[in-house]
Amino acid sequence: MKKQQICILGSTGSIGTQALDVIEQHPDRYEAYCLTANNRVDELAAQARKFNPAAVVIANEAHYDRLKQLLADMPDIKVYAGADALCQIVEAGPIDMVLTAMVGFSGLAPTIHAIKARKKICLANKETLVVAGELVCRLAAENRVPILPVDSEHSAIFQSIVGEGDNPIEKILLTASGGPFRKFTLDQMRDVTAADALKHPTWAMGAKITIDSASMMNKGFEVIEAKWLFGVPADKIQVLVHPQSIVHSAVQFCDGAVKAQLGVPDMRLPIQYAFSFPDRLPLNGDRLDLFKQPLEFFEPDLEKFRCLALAFESIKRGGNMPCIVNAANEVVNEGFRKGRCSFLGMGEIIEKTMAKATFSATPDYDTYIATDAEARRIAAELMALA
């Protein structure tokens, strides 16, 4: 069997490191062709030594010399730097699939290049579909490129519709853990810190997504992602708070039947399924024990979790509005982590940015680039005044 050559965009992050664990468990099937990182140069070099890829890319060019130096005794590994190098490397002939595990808007350009080069996409960068879902899905259809979801929720939805053909979907049930502040009052939420928000009850993730999970903006983004991936309007996507994170999501069909995917919270499972689909491969790890705990479901409180309501609002408005929300969110998320913005202030600044940024009903790629820059500037200015 020919080994599948995988390019991991963002190999030093939470998803990237777990993807390498999957590759390590199946060395007969998968090989890391290219590994990339933004700033974590030492980790990238260590991964390169272990997995011996054909190439590595460090997006931040300031780290290029350091990476070259760290890998000086491994001349077979080509070393590149810069955002353009990311877009070029995904087009490399030997690559079979690209795992987009970078965080934020920066994942959009390399994903588009990979689609145009007809590489199978294992999508973990949800911002790509939040910002430019229409464009990305159209390009994927034109190039006949499969997009396989890596988010645990979207993988669960995907697994629930496998074998269903054209059977109509009545509703998608998108589960959310509720994050660390699920039981907090609005008053209590005024004073929470980044350290409080980074203590996620069920998932171990990167810092940016952990804050998005605490504000429930992450779930709002996942609604947008589900809309594009599965062609289901947002009013047919119901968010359920499910603190145990065992039911990863479910699909209700036209006859009222509901199919769900359950499992322990382990991101390696959706990563591996995206790699191996339609096959299932063995995976070492914990197994689900349904006797351990009850499964609970609650309605989300949209007053407390304003960010989730704003995401739904952005879908309703359409056009470049989700792009505006994403850009503002990236700014306030980082601001909150650095103590420049309060937890509830994040939603307030995003809402004001939505009102101030230039709206476009029919955006193209250049519009998204301009919108992203404008919304970031507005959000940063609002944050400085707050």
Give a label for each model feature:
Residues 1-386:
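Catalytic, metal-anchored helix/loop core of enzyme active sites in primary metabolism
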